[in-house]
Amino acid sequence: MSGDWVHTGQALIWVLWIFAAIIRGSVTEEPHRYTRLGWVQGKQATVLGRLEPVNVFLGIPFAAPPLGPLRFSNPQPPIPWHDLREATTYPNVCFQNLEWLFIYQNLLKVHYPKLGVSEDCLYLNIYAPAYANDGSRLPVMMWIPGGGFETGSASIFDGSALAAYEDVLIVTIQYRLGIFGFFNTQNQHAPGNWAFQDQLAALQWVRENINYFGGNPDSVTIFGGSAGAISISSLILSPLSAGLFHRAIMQSGVAIIPSLKNFDDELKHGLQVVADVCKCNVSDSKVLLKCLREKSSLELLSLGQKTKAFTRVVDGSFFPEEPMELLSQKTFKTVPSIIGVNNQECGYILPMREAPEILFGSNESTALTLIHVLLHIPPQYMHIVAKDYFHGKHSLTDIRDTLLDLFGDVFFVVPGLVTARNHRDADGPVYFYEFQHRPNCFQNTRPAFVKADHTDEIRFVFGGPFLEGDVVMFEEATEDEKLLSRKMMSYWANFARSGDPNGDDLPLWPAYDQNESYLKLDVNISTGWRLKDRRVEFWTDTLPLIMSASKALLSPTFPLILFSLLPPSLLSIAS
């Protein structure tokens, strides 16, 4: 009798254990999840400071491989599979020059896993609390990586810490880069914007499948840095993304950022480079596409490095009009947004790649020459820029610091603030930040004058101090930096949950209203108002009005920064 009781009791214990496991998402070292395409098997990871593991699924396809006839075409649905698919190894990165990934590892003091490269690259990674399963309906945060639309990968970011600490589900994605992501013929044969179409395909996959991993398809926040932030800003403006996401975070990048707009003569030059390098006939778009689809990946990569003419285009579909037109019309979907910049966006990483000589100091003549070359400001107006920025600056280091600030203003701060104002005026909830902390890990590797450089905030957002896997994002973090990382993870996750970053034990983050309040993110968090208000006025009002009086707005050399930021009303007056 007692033996029967013991047997029954043990059986009951097993039933309760199994039931608990189901309730908690079947916590196992080899988690299995169903998708509409087939079953996947992931793995588990741990993070510092948390006992419960994170389920990790790597390399899940969200589109068919863009090979052969699918090169330079919209992404197609992924191919289903019948066996259990192992999702435990990193996918190939999209075709790019891997040299820059290796260089960035050293410059950024990070470590990436060993990654292959292929055009077969449309995959995503998922990081979820181990208990999450169908029915958990956790907020989803989809990260769109940056890299200047030329380099980058889903797998150089690890969402484990953010998922573990904040009970959110993290998705990191990949999209075609360089010429593979943006080649176009400006007609129906190859309208371009393939990279943005890939991002739409990833969002559609999330919409249809993320509930099986414990995510809520009705609570999707897209976030990204640099080119990823530009992509997010573009997705907000595009009518094709309607209903696919509900909140957005743009870290150091927006759609109206200068250098993204190319003119017809630049495209013609790019096509001529194609003709010269690939020996393809560019007079017939169909023939040209057939020729290019027969070229090797390396041949196309080499071609992309010889011309930068192929970038985002107004294709009548993803971009019905120029981004500034769409922004100023305020007909875009007004989702709650966080927009932010770092306080020295062009402090180190970007100059190291584009013009390293200026880091050692610059005189005013050299500085103005660089400004003229990079911004295409006509020589007769350079004295206006010099007076506004360099008045009273004499030492080489003072001029260098001012020049770096100018480039940061032009390419990041002013476009970000103009975008924030337009979102606010379209009745979209907006929160703005300036990240101000120089990471301690650069104490001995960066010049002392560098403050918070481009991308420095990312290691804090992803909980870099708490990662212990293949991706190393933040070695040598101080206790203050660990606390700042925890706070930033909480701000970002709170926003993903509700559209408001504020929460218990966090300094108040005011909305970006008519007072233009913003958060200063540093080890001691505080609030500011009207960030660089005079600089915004200079680039969007003072200088354009002076130039419009002399019809300089009609010149083909009109500076791209102003062309990107001017409201259509001023352009029409000038014409």
Swiss-Prot record:
Output one GO MF annotation.
carboxylesterase activity
Where's it mainly located?
secreted
Family designation: Belongs to the type-B carboxylesterase/lipase family.
This protein's UniProt keywords: Disulfide bond, Glycoprotein, Hydrolase, Secreted, Serine esterase, Signal
Q: Spell out the protein name for this chain.
A: Carboxylesterase 5A
What Pfam families has UniProt attached to this entry? COesterase (PF00135)
Name a GO CC annotation attached to this entry: extracellular region
Q: Which CDD domains match?
A: Esterase_lipase
Q: What function does the entry list? A: Involved in the detoxification of xenobiotics and in the activation of ester and amide prodrugs.
Highest classification ranks of the organism: Eukaryota, Metazoa, Chordata, Craniata, Vertebrata
Instruction: Spell out the reaction equation it catalyses.
Output: a carboxylic ester + H2O = an alcohol + a carboxylate + H(+)
User: Cross-referenced InterPro entries, in alphabetical order?
Assistant: AB_hydrolase_fold (IPR029058), CarbesteraseB (IPR002018), Carboxylesterase_B_AS (IPR019826), Carboxylesterase_B_CS (IPR019819), Type-B_Carboxylest/Lipase (IPR050309)
| Catalytic site | 226, 345, 454
Q: Which residues are glycosylated?
A: 281, 363, 515, 524
Which PROSITE patterns does the entry link to?
CARBOXYLESTERASE_B_1, CARBOXYLESTERASE_B_2
Record keyword Repeat present: no
Cell location: Secreted
Q: How does activity depend on pH?
A: Optimum pH is 7.2.
The source's domain of life comes to Eukaryota
Signal peptide from the UniProt entry: 1-28
